[in-house]
């Protein structure tokens, strides 16, 4: 399910750089799946595989390209209503993200920001990087509760935004290159940064739903059991990679560890810690994720 292109090796013990993530999610937050695509039919296929009542929010960020045009937000919403088992509306009418609803950003507007109440700020835009902007806004609003999905499209629109979602602890998923090939958005995403899921369209929606159902907002503080599990994971990564994460606060290790745990299907951090202890490859993959972004918090 996950895309792991290579396992890095390391002989250095230099302290790693950790990605900056939120330690807790905003009160009452729920997972939101942001979908970028430049093809209406692909969006229809993806959303036809969704299901109601799973408490996920959905954000559609269309990607126009020089060789293709997209319908208006109203027409796109109408097309999705015909196939999706969820209510669909435009961002102008919705105003904010809510669970169990698909919100469509107009192709001629850019999602500039999402505030703590998940209200949307849109501005007119003729720039081609609207998917990047929308993904970044979601990443900074929700952190580990954000899920980014890149589907069919040309060029690189969305690749940088997807990397930002992952850097801040969220999930990055792309449609299989076998369905679209080189020079497409999925290809750009895979060459920009690591991604977590690479699957054909028919399977992608199912795996995104499964991951989203398992997500829950972080507690205000970690339990003693969670702290102990994170310490085990840190020691295991150090043992396999020789990089020491013990100098960092456990809250800073949690997003990457939780994402890997959920992707692999482990029921608890303890179970995942045992897996990292036994599997050197997993330790290197987690090390890579922990190093994915700039600076973070040391123990005080």
Spell out what each predicted region is.
Residues 300:
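Hydrophobic (often cysteine-bearing) scaffold residues that line and stabilize catalytic clefts
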């Amino acid at each position: 399910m996950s895309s792991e292109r290579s396992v890095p090796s390391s002989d250095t013990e230099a302290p790693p750089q950790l990605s900056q993530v939120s330690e807790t999610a905003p009160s009452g937050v729920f997972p939101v799946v942001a979908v970028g695509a430049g093809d209406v039919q692909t969006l229809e296929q993806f959303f036809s595989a969704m299901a109601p009542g799973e408490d996920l929010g959905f954000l559609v960020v269309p990607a126009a390209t020089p060789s293709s045009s997209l319908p208006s937000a109203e027409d796109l919403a109408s097309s999705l209503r015909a196939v999706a088992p969820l209510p669909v509306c435009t961002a102008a009418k919705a105003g904010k993200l809510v669970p169990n609803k698909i919100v469509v950003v107009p192709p001629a507007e850019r999602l500039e920001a999402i505030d703590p109440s998940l209200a949307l700020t849109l501005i007119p835009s003729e720039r081609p990087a609207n998917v990047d902007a929308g993904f970044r806004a979601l990443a900074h609003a929700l952190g580990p509760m954000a899920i980014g999905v890149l589907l069919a499209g040309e060029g690189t629109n969305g690749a940088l935004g997807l990397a930002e979602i992952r850097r801040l602890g969220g999930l990055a998923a792309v449609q299989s290159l076998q369905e679209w090939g080189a020079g497409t958005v999925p290809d750009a995403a895979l060459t920009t940064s690591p991604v977590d899921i690479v699957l054909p369209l028919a399977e992608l929606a199912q795996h995104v739903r499964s991951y989203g159902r398992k997500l829950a907002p972080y507690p205000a503080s970690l339990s003693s059991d969670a702290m102990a599990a994170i310490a085990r994971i840190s020691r295991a990564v150090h043992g396999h990679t020789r990089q020491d994460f013990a100098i960092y606060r456990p809250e800073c290790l949690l997003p990457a560890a939780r994402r890997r745990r959920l992707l692999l299907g482990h029921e608890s951090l303890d179970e995942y810690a045992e897996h990292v202890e036994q599997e050197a490859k997993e330790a290197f993959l987690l090390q890579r994720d922990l190093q994915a972004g700039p600076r973070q918090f040391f123990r005080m």
